[in-house]
């Protein structure tokens, strides 16, 4: 089989693996959400305490403590301050 025909065959078959047999819906594995859910279920962690810095997106960073700019503070009693020339940072 020539290379072009083989490539077209692969391009035709490859997208089929992304559809479920039930209704042709795209199957999207959401590994990040699954890992986060398992993490939050351990111990006394609760998803309601999770502060996501990108509302409406399931790919945002989750902080169980206070958020400070793009990062999570390491402890619950920390607060966020702004350092001139260095940006936001946690003060504990």
Curated annotation (Swiss-Prot):
Its subcellular locations are:
Secreted
Expressed, tissue-wise, as follows: Expressed by the venom duct.
Q: Where 4-carboxyglutamate occurs, residue numbers?
A: 49
- Keyword Metal-binding appears in the UniProt entry: no
- Which domain of life does this protein belong to? Eukaryota
Range of residues in the leader sequence = 1-24
What this chain does, per the entry, is described as: Alpha-conotoxins act on postsynaptic membranes, they bind to the nicotinic acetylcholine receptors (nAChR) and thus inhibit them. Through its two C-terminal domains, this homodimeric protein would bind to two nAChR allosteric sites, located outside the nAChR C-loop of the principal binding face and at the adjacent binding interface in a clockwise direction. This toxin specifically blocks mammalian neuronal nAChR of the alpha-7/CHRNA7, alpha-3-beta-2/CHRNA3-CHRNB2 and alpha-4-beta-2/CHRNA4-CHRNB2 subtypes.
Per the UniProt entry, what species is this protein from, by scientific name?
A: Conus rattus (Rat cone)
Copy the domain comment. Answer: The cysteine framework is XX (C-CC-C-CC-C-C-C-C).
Please give the name of this protein: Alpha-conotoxin-like Rt20.2
- For the keyword Transcription, the answer is no
What does UniProt list as this organism's lineage? Eukaryota, Metazoa, Spiralia, Lophotrochozoa, Mollusca
> PTM 4-hydroxyproline: at which residues?
55
Quaternary form?
A: Hetero-, homo- or pseudo-homodimer (identical sequence, different post-translational modifications).
